[in-house]
Amino acid sequence: MAEKIGEFSMEHVVTSYSRNANGDIVSTTDWKGSGSSTTLGGAQVFGTFISAAPLSESNEKSGEIEFIGESFLENGTQIGNVASGAWEKAENEHSWKISMEGENSLGHKRRYEGTVDLENLIFNGEIYSLD
């Protein structure tokens, strides 16, 4: 079982759209915020979520998502992070549930779970160790 080691809160900065070679719509959203963990302490966090889907699936209830970002720790250390997983529209709510697994540049495996509130564009979540 994964151990909870931290929490984070990020706010939306900007979204851009493009098309890939398959003609899918690619959504790229940038976020910034802060987080803390029992293993690394506090950090400023910046990252990008990327998802792609055909135009005909624009109103889907779920899909794949990936995250690429960096954490800037209070001690000056910079850590890269990558993760992939899924998003799902919450039933009867204006929000998305996101669950991803990935690793950081220190080699630690992590799971991230959280909710994006689409009214105020805030992503709050928890970090779990998979080591």
Give residue spans per PLM region.
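Beta-strand-enriched cores of mature, soluble protein domains
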Residues: 1-131
